[in-house]
Amino acid sequence: MSAPRTLYDKIWDDHLVDEQADGTCLLYIDRHLVHEVTSPQAFEGLRMTGRKVRAPEKTLAVVDHNVPTSPDRHLGIKNEESRIQVEALATNAAEFGVEYYSASDKRQGIVHIVGPEQGFTLPGMTIVCGDSHTSTHGAFGALAHGIGTSEVEHVLATQTLIQKKAKNMLVRVDGQLPPHVTAKDIILAIIGEIGTAGGTGHVIEFAGEAIRALSMEGRMTVCNMTIEGGARAGLIAPDEKTFEYIKGKPRAPKGEALEQAIAYWKTLQTDEGAHYDRVVVLDAASLPPIVSWGSSPEDVISVQGIVPNPDDIPDETKRTSKWRALDYMGLKPGTKMTDITLDRVFIGSCTNGRIEDLREVAKVVEGKTVAPTVDAMIVPGSGLVKEQAEAEGLDKIFKAAGFDWREPGCSMCLAMNDDRLKPGERCASTSNRNFEGRQGFKGRTHLVSPAMAAAAAIAGHFVDIREWN
């Protein structure tokens, strides 16, 4: 009888082509997502060596990082470097026979929102993209992670990837979440617990009652930020919620093929007694709404907390780092999080730019008005999310409250397009990274859930969403 295996073990074994004595493996790749930033050199490498894309039907190209989200984006991209990258992707996709969603295609959006929407992402698959937040697709029980540009070229040419197997890590979130505490709070709490290096060298499987209770979109939020916890990939075993989400998606299996697929997907569960190299357990009932205070995703605290004092940290290197973070963020130890005022609010990104996120925001802001001191924007994660939100009338609620309702794209998650912070501006953001300069030169980013961001936009400062009227 074979040894019990984890979900990661099973997907790995199903895709292992070859293994060398030193542990170097060749892994088959089922799906390859491509965007404009990390692919130009990869396609050029194919061109220079006379190679083709081995499996264009398993490759999907989407523009997201550089595209403007302003209503006039049909007039073109002003920044020359951004325009060149977008044009290169269109040219490369056409030349190499890869399906491509341009900025004028309603299926366009952030690549990690588009993949699941289209049924391109399926359980048990290996999925890669030249983007660190590829871990998002792990919500479907797929082994998904980011790769570098040279690896993008390798996958395009061979549909395989060379790598060594990671260790297994389990993060279990037991119990039920309190009202108004979300998937975003779960993953921020996990990163706060394990640190940004806590998952290094591991693939994390998320499990427990609180994880199972999440919708597919909530699970995508959790898996999206696995990389911020240091792990290469995050996984959640598929279940009936997964199967229901997939049914009817454009690229998903249909009819008998779907039934056969579901029969296989049901085997994608960790066996009883399987070994994890590390186990972390959190109590869902104890989790509050969370806000980041520093310049790392591990710098998190309850919205009811105060900015911590780095002098309380024994390790000198870490202590120095946290003082630097406070200096950058313009904060002093002991400041109440609810006393921190804001200049900007950004709701969107591959972490929280889906329809359920926007519905939560609408509940918070309906009938209210954005604070006069705040500039707030909502960026749907894809053209289909935008279409759905407008069909439900959410855009009218947002506009009436004073939010800027934008076109789909990565937007202010990162300073690679026109949406960015000015030096010194403080932003409540539903994105995934609060590094120095991430949203703009000397911009100050606080990571929060969509509902928390929405409430902060109305109040002009952080508020506890549990006390929101």
From Swiss-Prot:
Record-listed E.C. numbers: 4.2.1.33
Keyword match Cell cycle: no
Residues where [4Fe-4S] cluster binds: 350, 410, 413
Similarity annotation: Belongs to the aconitase/IPM isomerase family. LeuC type 1 subfamily.
HAMAP family xrefs: LeuC_type1
Pathway participation: Amino-acid biosynthesis; L-leucine biosynthesis; L-leucine from 3-methyl-2-oxobutanoate: step 2/4
PROSITE patterns tied to this protein: ACONITASE_1, ACONITASE_2
InterPro entries: 3-IsopropMal_deHydase_lsu, Acnase/IPM_dHydase_lsu_aba_1/3, Acoase/IPM_deHydtase_lsu_aba, Aconitase_4Fe-4S_BS, Aconitase_4Fe-4S_dom, IPM_dehydratase_rel_enz, IPMI_cat
Co-factor binding details: Binds 1 [4Fe-4S] cluster per subunit.
Cofactor requirements of the protein: [4Fe-4S] cluster
Annotated function: Catalyzes the isomerization between 2-isopropylmalate and 3-isopropylmalate, via the formation of 2-isopropylmaleate.
GO molecular function, one term: 4 iron, 4 sulfur cluster binding
Gene: leuC
NCBIfam families: leuC (TIGR00170), PRK05478.1 (NF004016), PRK12466.1 (NF009116)
EC main group: lyase
GO BP of this protein: L-leucine biosynthetic process
UniProt key word Iron: yes
Protein name as it appears in the record: 3-isopropylmalate dehydratase large subunit
Quaternary structure note: Heterodimer of LeuC and LeuD.
